Amino acid sequence: MNKLVKLFTIFISAITLTIASISSSFAKVEGEYIVLGSAISLTGKYSSNGVHTQNGYNMAVDRINKMGGVKVGGKSYKFEIIYYDDESNPKRAAQLAERLIKQDGVHYMLGPYSSGLTKAIAPVTEKYKIPMVEANGASRSLFTKGYKYLFAVLSPANQYLEVAIDLAVEKNGGKPVRIAQAFEQDA
């Protein structure tokens, strides 16, 4: 539970700092709302985790809105999110990111579930200079491309087990430890 609270706090901080750091004149503002966009897997092979990601985004936005929103330029705004189902398809995810930016006019994106889908969307958000807070893409390669508009709340996947392995070695008196890791290569 403590880890969940920590991740939630990091997510809230990242989204608030990202939006607060950019002038509100660039934001799509509907009345007193800043509109965020997200191409996310609601169907297809990533749908289970995509729905969890959407629930997390909704929980964060609901909490921010209940706390009065975010202050930008001395004015408070609440958030609204436009979602499109990327069908767990990278090509579709990139198309929907383009649609959210060009047709819907969003100026802030919330990332999809999966490193592969994030890899498809990141070039689009970079092209249009749209900040994207990424909650679930963790492939190391995402962080070696020099993206200026991609902000992550997780450490890269290659760091997930470092602490656990160090602890296992320590508990084993420094002797070699055998481990196995299974993963999907989707990025």
Predicted features, each with a name:
Residues 49-68, 160-163, 187:
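Short, solvent-exposed amphipathic alpha-helices that sit
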Residues 28-31, 35, 48-55, 67-144, ...:
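Beta-alpha junction/loop-to-helix N-cap segments that form part of ligand/metal-binding clefts
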Residues 1-35:
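Short, low-complexity disordered leader/linker segments with a strong preference
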Residues 38, 111, 181:
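Redox-cofactor binding/interface segments in oxidoreductases and associated redox assembly factors
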Residues 37-45:
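Acidic/histidine-rich, surface-exposed loop or edge segments in extracytoplasmic proteins
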Residues 42, 148-187:
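An alpha-beta-alpha
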Residues 63, 67, 99, 166-171:
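A generic secondary-structure signal
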Residues 12, 57, 61, 97:
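Short amphipathic alpha-helical/adjacent loop interface patches that line ligand
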